[in-house]
Design a protein with these regions (language model features):
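Secondary-structure junction motif
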Residues: 106-108, 185-186, 194-218, 285-287, ...
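Hydrophobic/proline-rich hinge and linker segments of small-molecule sensing/allosteric domains
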Residues: 160-201, 270-280, 293
Length: 302
């Protein structure tokens, strides 16, 4: 008989990339993990994983089984949360993810603060994640809502994705950089010789992907710096002189004092922020979405 624990362990092994990392994340011994997966395979009657010396691969049966196992676990978590929310009569927990390039300042902060003031029985749990990871966790029930940067590379049919506003992109650079002395906006083509502290990941969209699109439109691909970051720590790398980056204007609010910001000459130098949530989610999530879309201050959309 297949158990939920076996499903959970199987999915975690695949998403973690192997038994060792999954065991660390689950706080169980690898031997126990292996035993549960073998029992799952015995119950199904066919192998789901190929165990190599360094990595684990899905068999054809495993590839067919994985999305259904993920969906089952996500549906179970959604059902559990819905029952708890109904029983708590307006009280509950909302798990909100946000990209590192979507700092919760200004209008976003005001909207969150306003929601919590109206819904005094609700708690928010905030997690900083990449746009693509947010979508995966939303689809699988590990997050309730996500604030992310477009574009995203994967479409999830079970998710709503609502663009909220466009935000100007600025050139972030060290205060002593020669370009920081300019008064006129900087053309993207002038950055062809610069090194960038954030470049696209092959399997992620978001801000770095959008920045690379703009650079390609100006005739070059961003040259990687020797020190790279996909988090807000890129501002510290810029401050240290490792390179430059295209960042949203809202990141000025969290930047070190030795980082300067320059306007870009191109009208298309902007990035979009979006809100994501599951289509079949709970009244608590739907209530948050309705409030958030109606009460996001205008300055967040400028």
């Amino acid at each position: 008989m297949i158990s939920l624990r076996q499903l959970h362990y199987f999915v975690e092994i695949v998403e973690s990339g192997g038994f060792s990392r999954a065991a660390e994340r689950l706080f169980v011994a690898q031997s126990a993990l292996s035993r549960q997966v073998r029992e799952l395979e015995d119950s199904i009657g066919t192998p789901l994983l190929r165990r190599g010396p360094r990595q684990v691969e899905l068999t054809p049966a495993g590839r067919a089984f994985l999305p259904r196992a993920q969906r089952l676990l996500g549906d179970l978590e959604a059902a559990r949360r819905l029952a708890r929310e109904v029983g708590e009569d307006g009280h509950g927990l909302l798990r909100l993810g946000h990209s590192s390039s979507v700092p919760l300042v200004g209008g976003l902060q005001a909207a969150l603060r306003g929601y919590l003031a109206v819904q005094s029985g609700v708690r928010l749990e905030l997690t900083q994640q990449s746009s693509e990871q947010q979508l995966a966790d939303l689809a699988e029930g590990r997050l309730d809502l996500g604030l992310l940067r477009l574009p995203v590379l994967r479409q999830h049919p079970r998710l709503h994705l609502r663009a909220l506003y466009r935000e100007p992109l600025l050139l972030a650079l060290a205060a002593d950089h020669p370009l920081a002395r300019r008064e006129a906006p900087v053309a993207l083509a002038a950055l062809a010789g610069e090194t960038f502290v954030s470049i696209p990941h092959l399997q992620r969209g978001g801000l770095s992907y959008r920045a690379a699109e703009l650079c390609l439109g100006a005739g070059f691909y961003p040259r990687p710096a020797r020190a790279l970051s996909r988090k807000t720590s890129q501002l510290q790398l810029i401050e240290a002189g490792f390179g430059v980056a295209l960042v949203p204007a809202s990141m000025r609010a969290i930047a070190p004092p030795a980082v300067s910001f320059m306007s870009l000459a191109e009208a298309e130098a902007y990035s979009e922020v979006a809100l994501a949530w599951r289509r079949d989610d709970s009244p608590l999530v739907e209530g948050f979405v309705e409030y958030f879309l109606e009460n996001l201050p205008n300055e967040a959309k400028d």
